[in-house]
């Protein structure tokens, strides 16, 4: 991934990013660090198609892209796990996993197939989840695993994690780091947005610092 000269100015004149260059190597865990308001999340929202740059270019795998929506970003193998999870609490883990791409039996989600897909991906990536549990009933660490699996099942090869340890216990953070190392070994590329230097030093290969 190459982001060249990225500028984002909102209609009210506030500049979130000005002339930012960001380079991401395949198969690395790359930290994006900076104080609140430095534009870290905004930059990654542009890579995920949630926002569009005012100017600048985004290249992925040698191709210049116009990432006009998350759907476009996902089609190019980019996934994002937000700080505030985007799961439907009243649905099961399996139903959340296939939401929007659900295997169907007539008008209804094919629940057995959704469970099978969830189990397959959970095993493949060593991310333990409970497919039949309602999201409202599972702990925060497992919700995060569901979000990661959701991105992977949609074909993400580049995974953006926005402040992923902010809501986790110490033990859940240890588990997350183990899972991220496992994904890296399988060739995935990870952006780790954080301001916790001790975590960055432990888990990441390279670091980009953004100043406000």
Predicted regions and their residues:
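Glycine-rich phosphate-binding loops of nucleotide-dependent enzymes
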Residues: 1-212
């Amino acid at each position: 991934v190459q982001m060249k000269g990225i500028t984002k100015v909102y209609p009210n004149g506030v500049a979130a990013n000005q002339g930012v260059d960001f380079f991401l190597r395949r198969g690395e865990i790359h930290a994006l660090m900076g104080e609140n308001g430095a534009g870290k999340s905004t930059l990654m929202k542009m890579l995920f198609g949630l926002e569009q740059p005012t100017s600048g270019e985004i290249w992925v795998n040698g191709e210049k892209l116009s990432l006009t929506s998350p759907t476009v970003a996902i089609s190019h193998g980019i996934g994002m796990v937000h700080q505030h999870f985007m799961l439907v609490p009243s649905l099961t883990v399996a139903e959340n996993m296939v939401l929007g791409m659900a295997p169907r039996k007539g008008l209804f989600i094919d629940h057995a197939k959704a469970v099978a897909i969830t189990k397959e991906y959970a095993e493949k990536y060593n991310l333990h989840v409970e497919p039949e549990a309602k999201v409202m009933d599972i702990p925060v660490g497992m919700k995060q695993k569901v979000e990661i699996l959701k991105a992977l099942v949609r074909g993400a090869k580049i995974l953006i994690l926005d402040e992923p340890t902010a809501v986790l216990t110490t033990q859940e953070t240890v588990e997350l780091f183990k899972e991220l190392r496992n994904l890296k070994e399988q060739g995935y590329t990870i952006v780790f947005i954080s301001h916790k230097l001790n975590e960055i030093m432990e888990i990441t290969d390279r670091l980009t610092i953004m100043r406000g």
